Amino acid sequence: MQIHERHRPVDFLEVSARLQPHGPVRHNDFVLKFWPQPYEMTLFPDGRAIIKGTTDTAVARSLYARYVGS
């Protein structure tokens, strides 16, 4: 499920530090991956995200808001 809630750049260092307590996080200059079980979230610098583990838009948006912010 692709989500694009933010329309501003994402600071991977700041988001990564905030996500560490919630599950494994990896990132480079192009992508941040986060695994809040049972989901997998891939975040891009422009704010887009791909959330695996659900086909429900409401769940995907809720996960995005919870972990990335709106």
Language-model features: where?
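Generic recognition of long tandem-repeat/solenoid scaffolds
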Residues: 1-5, 30-35, 51
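Generic C-terminus detector
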Residues: 37-70
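Short Lys/Arg-enriched alpha/beta "domain-start" segment
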Residues: 1-23
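Intrinsic, low-complexity N-terminal interaction/targeting segments
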Residues: 20-34
